[in-house]
Structures are given as C-alpha cells and as structure tokens.
Regions:
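Flexible, acidic glycine-rich loops studded with aromatic residues
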Residues: 359-375, 381-528
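Exposed aromatic-hydrophobic patches
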Residues: 571, 622-628
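Disordered, acidic Ser/Thr/Pro-rich linker "stalks" and the adjacent N-terminal cap
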Residues: 520-579, 586-601, 617-618, 650-654
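Short beta-strand-plus-loop segments that form exposed binding edges in beta-rich domains
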Residues: 636-644
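Active-site neighborhood of glycoside hydrolase catalytic domains
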Residues: 257, 271-273, 277-373, 380-388
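Contiguous, structured surface segment used for ligand recognition
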Residues: 3-140, 470, 485-519
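Feature activates predominantly on carbohydrate-active enzymes
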Residues: 75-307, 348, 352, 452, ...
Length: 654
C-alpha cells in the first residue's frame, strides 16, 4: 500500500483499511479554532483543485458533517512534537496533531494524496482508506539558500517555502551576506545596501576567472523580510538568518571601511567580483563590535528565530597576522594566535546574542581556538568536527558537503556540461541515491550524543545559479531525499521504495512548472544471470559486490578496507557450466599503476561448491585460465595481506 502512494517523507506507520473517501467541492473542513491559519491554507489548496469555494466550519469538532476533513489537536498523543495521526474513512478525513505543527504536517500528507494538477479534470477524487501515525525523527529539518552570491525575488522564495512545507522541512537557513553582496536592509547603516549590495561584475558560466562587466545586485527591504518571515511562520517554517562574521565580510567592509583592518599594507576593500575565499575580515575593534551589535539588533527584531547564524567559516587570518592592532588585542587578551582571536570574536558575539535571548549557530570553523559552550555547530567539513563538538557537549546540525551540498553535480559532469555552460556546478557529485543513503546520526556513539544532533540540512550555495530556474534544477528532486532522511529513522528507509514514491511526487513538481532535474538512478545491484556472489570484504560507497559480475563496463566492485589473508569473493553460478570455459578476473583502478589491484591471490573453481582448485595466480592484478564443464563456483582468494583496497571490474566467463 505504502509503495503505491506518492508520500515523501514516508509516514512512520501506514496501515491500509477497507473502502475509500470521495473528496469533492461538497467536502467541508471542520476545525479546532487554534488551527484557523492551517485551515485557510488547506482550503485554498482544495479550492484550486475543485474550482469552488471550500466551506470551513469552526465548531470545535462537535458535529460531524456528511463529507468532511476534520482538523483536531490532542497533546496527549504518544508522539514527538510535530507528530500527527490521520485517518481516511468513507465519511471523511481526520487529522489530529500532537501540536499545531503536527496538524500542519498531517495536512501536507493529505495534500500529497490529492491530484497534482489543478483544477482536477474530474469534480471529485477518491482517496484510499488508511490509518497513519507519524512523527519526525529530527527537530531541525533544514534547507539553506545563499542569496549573497546571487539575488532572487521574494516571490520565488515564497514558492520555495511552499515546497519546503510540502516536504515537511521546517528550517529555512537564509544566507544574507557575502563577499559578493550584502542583501539585508539595515536602517542604521544604509551604505550596507547602497554600496555593499552591488558588485561591478560576475564571472560568466564556463569561465570562473573572467568578468561579464555587468553591474549586479539587489537587497531585501525590512518590509519584504517581515512578509517572508510571516509567510514562513504560517507554514511552520522558522527562518534562521545568517550574517557572516568575521570573514566573508568584504561587501560590508567595502561599505564601511573603518571596520576592517585599516593598518595593513594595500588596504583597499571592495565588493568582490570573483568567487572563492577573500582576505577581508572584520577588525577586532570595539567600534566593530558596536557596529555588528547594531546590525544584529535589527536582525533580531526582524527574525523571531531562537537561532541566529553568524557564519564563522573560511575566515583567513592573514590580515589579523599583519595588523598591529589585532596583534595588540591578542596580547591584551592573552590569546596565543589568530585562531584564538577568532574564538574571542565569536564569544563576544555569542554573549551579545545571549543578551537578546538568542542562540548562536556557526559553521564548524567556530571551534578553531575553542568552541563557545552554548553554540550550536553546523558541520560541513570533516565529520571529526562533529565528534569534537559532541565530546564537548555542544549540539550540532549535520550539513556535510559530501552528502548535503546541493550545489554539487547530480549527474556526471560530462553529461551536464554537454547540455551547455549554464549547467556548470562548483564540482563534486551528489546523486539522489547518495544523499538518501546518508545517516545524520552516524557520528553518534551513544544515545546522549544522538540527542545532541538536532537534525540535518541541505545547502544551496549559488555561485553557479544565476537565476531561479537553475536553483530549482539543483534543488529538485534532491530536496525529497533530504526530507526523508530528516523525517524517517534509519531503519525505516528504503531507497527502492522511495524511488517509486518519488515518481509520484515529481508529478507535483511538473504540475507547478518546477525546473527539476531527472534523477540519476544507480545501477541495480544484481548479477547478470541470477548467480549469487558474496564477499568477506566491506563495500565502499555504492560499489556493490554484484557489480563484479553484472556484465556492465561502467560498474565495479570496490572493497572498503585493506585486504587480509583469506579474504574472498565467491561466485556461485546459477547453473553448472555445460562446457569448458575461460575465466578472467581483472582488478585495479586507473589512479595509479598499482591502484587497488590484487597483488597476492588465487583464482579458483569448484565442481561441488566446497572443494577448491587453483586456476591461476594473480599477476599485475589479473588472473585467467580455463575451468572444466560442471563447474559450479568461482573464487578469488587473497593469499597475503595488502594495504591497497581492491577494485574488481568484471569476472568474465567465456
């Protein structure tokens, strides 16, 4: 039942029932008065489908209507915050939230059961009877969007918020300041937008070290920001703003040069026109801290979020190391080096945010020189930094670049660039299947550390996303995989089932005109003729053992550790050979002459499946020879340990 329904995230518990419910223009919504905002959103969606006004009745759920959707609350439900129960029966749909956010999550599940295209071709739709009990695994289910490198209209951001809600994501991390542009209006410092919001040029697609010579920029007014915050809040999404400091600050320093390190040689700040990391960082002056506190005061007034993100990443120390004043601060404060100066800088900001009853979030570089005790660390680099924060008792949000950076290519780079320079990405490779396979809790060693992992977040860095269509292409459908790993516990995940459901959800994307990518499906993990293959070795990434005997030139098995004596790969044929055959096994990668090839091993065969006879020794990573009719199995046996891992391209029998 679950596999046939386009539900992403998959509900934790879904049970099929007898019968169905017919939703039509005659269906009314009966709701608890605390759910009036959520009811209005649902009613609007149904009206778009039916083409007629939806009747909504706030009668505290006392009188059941003949055809209805009932929205209720029950804090006693044995579910996590944000959980809900949903029943579809012949007389109607009932959604009961543990809290208001849970009721809204249930509404999103209902909307995914409705037709994608609006208005409906028919005047009604039949929904299968079912029972759902559902709750989120993580409280932080986030998407990040960089509006510093490129600026996007507020109406597009609202559509993005809608899609986040549809996927039950609940944190929008809004990256608002960068070396290449300052995007948030600050009343006290108007030059931040008059100067900092505009750059003189932008690298064109296909030439990262060139300029298009076109002035570029834009910013969000405080009124626009208030509107977006309210829009997101109505959809149970918290907007966490990011104001970068002490680095990625060139645009701000270009607007107000006095807050940079003015005593260094060649000081000449400007809004940057190239991507990458730039040296301009805020000076550790008292005037700078007052400047930043003034900015953050206005930010806190605009954003009710408990969390304020201060960046903290990729802050070069070269200017501090050149600055006489910065060195004097280090000496005065007893700081050993510029790393500790960054920690001092972050702690000053943390203390200020605490005075505003806000909590600091920063990228994992904020631990350099010492991690503030109450800070939440957003992990994007090596997972060892997550372990470091967990050891110290800090909370973390997992946002690893290898698994959650949606600015990476999602299909082979050659294939993408063959379609045009506008398909350029920063690099990397993150297909849907790889993102789906990520477990945010993999770094936790015990339940205490698991609770310190607040959740997971996908990142959209936009150097190579000049317009909204490109943002959509990079975000969809990978956002669906992100949503499921943020909502479901690991033991409930199943990629094959997810992939079936994704086809249904992509119909919603298409109906809305979203410029989605075509997901890259991994090769099926099966042998070419139904033979059984097994190994004593771990598997690296998605390079399954079946790929050693699948008949495809573009797949291979890759072991995930060093080899030990008596490690093996054993192929048990579907049926015995009927004639003499020649067997060849080729190992080794292309990275180097000796890369991941078998140095010491034997190729063996068996007629009875248990007695093994040597065919040949491996030499330069290859073994071949003839085996007799009636052979039932082949084996690659490691005869000596080796530090290289092992790649097996294909076991051929001819």
């Amino acid at each position: 039942m679950a596999q046939s329904l386009p539900l992403i995230p998959q509900p934790k518990v879904l049970q099929k029932q007898e019968g169905s419910f017919v939703l039509s223009a005659a269906t009314a919504i009966r709701f608890d008065r605390q759910l009036s905002v959520e009811t209005a959103i649902l009613a609007d969606k149904i009206e778009r489908l039916t083409g007629e006004k939806t009747r909504s009745v706030a009668e505290e759920l006392r009188i059941m209507l003949s055809s209805e959707i009932a929205l209720d609350l029950d804090s006693s439900l044995a579910l996590k915050p944000g959980g809900y129960e949903m029943t579809v029966a012949p007389r109607g749909v009932k959604i009961t939230g543990k809290d208001v956010a849970g009721a809204f999550a249930g509404i999103q599940t209902l909307l995914q059961l409705l037709p994608a295209a609006a208005p409906m071709a028919e005047k009604s739709v039949s929904l299968p009877a079912l029972k759902i009990s559902d709750e989120p695994e993580y409280g932080w289910r986030g998407m990040h969007l960089d509006c510093g490198r490129h600026f996007y209209p507020i109406e597009e951001l609202k559509k993005f918020i809608d899609q986040m809600a549809f996927h039950k994501l609940n944190v929008f991390h809004w990256h608002l300041t960068e070396d290449q542009g300052w995007r948030i209006e600050i009343k006290k410092y108007p030059k931040l937008t008059a100067v900092g919001a505009f750059r003189d040029s932008t690298p064109p697609y296909g030439n990262r070290n060139s300029d298009d010579g076109k002035r570029y920029g834009g910013f969000y007014t405080q009124e626009q920001i208030k509107q977006l915050v309210a829009y997101a809040s109505a959809r149970h999404i918290t907007i966490v703003p990011e104001i970068e400091l002490p680095g990625h600050a060139a645009a701000a320093i270009a607007a107000y040069p006095q807050f940079g390190n003015t005593d260094i040689p060649g000081y000449n700040p400007k809004v940057m026109t190239r991507w990458g990391v730039h040296p301009y960082v805020f000076a550790p002056k008292e005037e700078t801290f007052r400047f930043l506190e003034d900015i953050l005061t206005e930010v806190c007034d605009l954003f009710p979020s408990k969390f304020i993100h201060i960046g903290g990443d990729e802050a070069p120390k070269s200017q501090w190391n050149q600055s006489k004043f910065a060195k004097e601060v280090m000496q005065r404060e007893g700081l050993k080096n510029a790393d500790e100066l960054q920690s001092y800088f972050i702690r000053r900001i943390e203390k200020f945010l605490a005075s505003k009853n806000r909590s600091l979030v920063g990228w994992d570089e904020i631990q350099e020189g010492g991690l503030p005790k109450s800070a939440t660390m957003m992990v994007w680099r090596d997972l060892k930094w997550a372990q470091h924060a967990l050891d110290l008792g800090n909370n973390v949000v997992m946002a690893p670049n290898a698994y959650a950076y949606l600015d990476h290519y999602q299909r082979p780079v050659g294939e993408e660039l063959s379609k045009g320079a506008e398909f350029e990405a920063i690099g990397g490779f993150l297909p849907v299947s790889k993102l789906y396979g990520y477990d945010p809790a993999s770094v936790a060693r015990n339940e205490k550390e698991r609770k310190q992992i607040l959740g997971v977040q996908g990142q959209l860095w936009t150097e190579y996303m000049k317009d909204w269509k490109k943002v959509e292409y990079m975000a969809f459908p990978r956002i669906a995989a992100l949503a499921e790993i943020a909502w479901l516990p690991k033991d409930k995940k199943n990629y094959e089932d997810f992939r079936v459901r994704l086809d249904g959800v992509m119909k919603f994307y298409d109906a809305l005109g979203i410029n989605r990518a075509v997901p890259l499906d991994p090769p099926q993990k099966k042998t070419k003729d139904g033979s059984v293959i097994e190994t004593s070795l771990n598997v690296h990434a998605d390079h399954a053992i079946e790929f050693a005997y699948d008949g495809r030139a573009n797949t291979f098995f890759w072991a995930g550790r060093e080899l030990k004596k008596d490690d093996h790969i054993t192929l048990r044929l579907k049926s015995p050979l009927t004639a003499v055959a020649r067997v060849t096994v080729q190992t080794g990668g292309k990275a180097s002459q000796n890369g991941d090839r078998l140095e010491k091993g034997e190729l063996q065969y068996s007629v009875d499946g248990s007695t093994w006879i040597k065919v040949a020794d491996f030499s330069e990573g290859k073994a071949s020879g003839s085996i007799p009719a009636q052979s039932k199995a082949l084996r690659v046996l490691v005869t000596a340990p080796q530090k290289f891992w092992l790649i097996v391209h294909e076991m051929t029998i001819e």
